[in-house]
From Swiss-Prot:
Keywords: Chaperone, Cytoplasm, DNA replication, Metal-binding, Repeat, Stress response, Zinc, Zinc-finger. This is Chaperone protein DnaJ. Residues 5-69 form the J domain. One of its GO terms (molecular function) is heat shock protein binding. Zn(2+) 1 binds at residues 144, 147, 201, 204. The gene is dnaJ. CXXCXGXG motif repeats lie at residues 144-151, 161-168, 187-194, 201-208. It comes from Oceanobacillus iheyensis (strain DSM 14371 / CIP 107618 / JCM 11309 / KCTC 3954 / HTE831). GO terms for biological process: chaperone cofactor-dependent protein refolding; DNA replication; protein refolding; response to heat. One of its GO terms (cellular component) is cytoplasm. InterPro entries: DnaJ, DnaJ_C, DnaJ_domain, DnaJ_domain_CS, HSP40/DnaJ_pept-bd, HSP_DnaJ_Cys-rich_dom, HSP_DnaJ_Cys-rich_dom_sf, J_dom_sf. A zinc finger (CR-type) spans 131-213. The lineage of its organism: Bacteria, Bacillati, Bacillota, Bacilli, Bacillales.
Length: 375
C-alpha cells in the first residue's frame, strides 16, 4: 500500500498557508499523541502526522514534495539511486536524504529530556476558591546513586558495543531494482544505546535509574477550577545522558459542596423562604464563601427570583478580580400544618389570596434560566 498524500494526512489543500498547516498539525498531534490516545493505531497516525508536517512546514521540502511526491527527485541532481549503496538510514529517514539530512544517524548518547509526569489532586470546594500551599509525594524515576546513572557496577564502566561500534544502529544492505540500499535498524545487542554493560549495578539492575518517592511543594493558586492543571517545571522524570528533567503536571479535581455550585468565577446557591417571608419580605443572613452577608428580600418575592451579591464569588485564577454570588429564591410549601394553620390559609384564600398576575406566571421559568446563566 502506497503512502498517503501529506496534504490529505493534515486535512488541508495544496494552497494552504503555513498558519493553516501548523494549526491542523497541532490539532491532529494532540488527537493522536500516544499519551492521550490509547487506540492501537494512534502511535502510527501520530508518526504519520509528524512526518507530513516536517515536510510541508519547510518551504524547500514542500516545493520538492509538490514536484516529485513520495518518489523523490531521483535523477534530478540528487545523485539518483544507481551505482554504489545509498545510505537511507531506514524508511523514517528517507526525507532526510532527499531534503538535506544526508542520512545522518541519531547519537544514542545525546542528552534526552525526561518524561513528563501527571498527578491528580483532589481539593475541597473552599481550597479551590482560596488556594493553598501543600506538599505531595510522587513515585518517579531518579538517577541511581550507586552507579551515578551509568548502570554499571561501581568500579566498572559501560563498554562500547562491538556490533554497532557505539552508533546504536546496525546497517543492513539490500539489493533493489534501484541498486543497493542500506537500511538502518536499532542495534539489538545494545538496544540502541551504543553501550554494553558487562557488570550491571546491583541496585538498579543496569537501568541507571531507581524509583523513589519524591516530596514536591505545590502552590495552588486561588480560583483554580475543576480540570485545570498546574505545570511544575523540571519536576518530572530525570533526563538521560545529562538531558533536562521532564515536567510535572498537577490536574485538579474539586469535591462538590453541599450548598454552593460554581460556574467559572461565579458561585450559585438556593435560598429557601417560607410563604410568610416571601409575601411580607424579610432581611436574612446568607452564607457566602467569604462569610455571611445580609440580603433584603422584598415583599412579594417569587420562586425563581435571583439576587446578585457582587464580588462574593471565586477569585479569577489569573488575578482578574472576583466573580459574583447568585442567590435563587425557592419558596417552600409547608407539609405539616396544624388545623389552625389550615383554617388561616382557607380564610386567606377566601379573601382573594390565591390571585396572581399572568406576568408572574409567564416569567417564572425565564427567571429560573437567567439565574443559572448569571444574568
Amino acid at each position: 500500500m502506497g503512502k498517503r498524500d501529506y496534504y490529505e494526512i493534515l486535512g488541508i489543500d495544496k494552497s494552504a498557508s503555513q498558519d493553516e498547516i501548523k494549526k491542523n498539525y497541532r490539532k491532529l498531534a494532540r488527537k493522536y499523541h500516544p499519551d492521550v490516545n490509547k487506540e492501537a493505531d494512534a502511535a502510527e497516525k501520530f508518526k504519520e502526522v509528524k512526518e507530513a508536517y516536517e515536510v510541508l512546514s519547510d518551504d524547500q521540502k514542500r516545493a520538492q514534495y509538490d514536484q516529485f511526491g513520495h518518489s523523490g527527485p531521483q535523477s534530478q541532481g540528487f545523485g539518483g539511486f544507481g551505482g554504489g549503496a545509498q545510505d537511507f538510514g531506514g524508511f523514517g529517514d528517507i526525507f532526510d536524504m532527499f531534503f538535506g539530512g544526508g542520512g545522518r544517524s541519531r547519537d544514542p548518547n545525546a542528552p534526552q529530556q525526561g518524561n513528563d509526569l501527571q498527578y491528580t489532586m483532589i481539593l475541597d470546594f473552599e481550597e479551590a476558591v482560596f488556594g493553598k500551599e501543600t506538599d505531595i509525594e510522587i513515585p518517579k524515576e531518579e538517577s541511581c546513586d550507586t552507579c551515578n546513572g551509568s548502570g554499571a557496577k561501581p568500579g566498572t564502566k559501560p563498554e562500547t558495543c562491538s556490533h554497532c561500534h557505539g552508533s546504536g544502529q546496525l546497517n543492513q544492505e539490500q539489493n533493489t531494482p534501484f541498486g543497493r540500499v542500506v537500511n538502518r535498524r536499532v542495534c539489538n545487542y545494545c538496544q540502541g544505546t551504543g553501550k554494553i554493560i558487562p557488570d550491571k549495578c546491583n541496585t538498579c539492575g543496569g537501568s541507571g535509574t531507581v524509583q523513589k518517592n519524591k516530596k514536591i511543594h505545590i502552590s495552588i493558586p486561588a480560583g483554580i477550577d475543576e480540570g485545570q492543571q498546574i505545570r511544575v517545571a523540571g519536576k518530572g522524570e530525570s533526563g538521560k545522558n545529562g538531558g533536562p528533567a521532564g515536567d510535572l503536571f498537577v490536574v485538579i479535581k474539586v469535591r462538590p459542596h453541599d450548598f454552593f455550585v460554581r460556574e467559572g468565577d461565579h458561585i450559585f446557591c438556593e435560598l429557601p423562604l417560607t410563604y410568610a417571608q416571601a409575601a411580607l419580605g424579610d432581611e436574612l443572613e446568607v452564607p457566602t464563601v467569604h462569610g455571611k452577608v445580609k440580603v433584603k428580600v422584598p415583599a412579594g418575592t417569587q420562586t425563581g427570583k435571583t439576587f446578585r451579591i457582587k464580588g462574593k464569588g471565586a477569585p479569577n485564577v489569573r488575578g482578574r478580580g472576583h466573580g459574583d454570588q447568585h442567590i435563587k429564591i425557592k419558596v417552600m410549601t409547608p407539609t405539616n400544618l396544624s388545623e389552625k394553620q389550615k383554617d388561616l390559609l382557607r380564610e386567606f384564600n377566601e379573601l382573594g389570596g390565591n390571585e396572581s398576575t399572568d406576568e408572574q406566571d409567564d416569567n417564572i421559568f425565564q427567571r429560573f434560566r437567567r439565574a443559572f446563566k448569571g444574568e
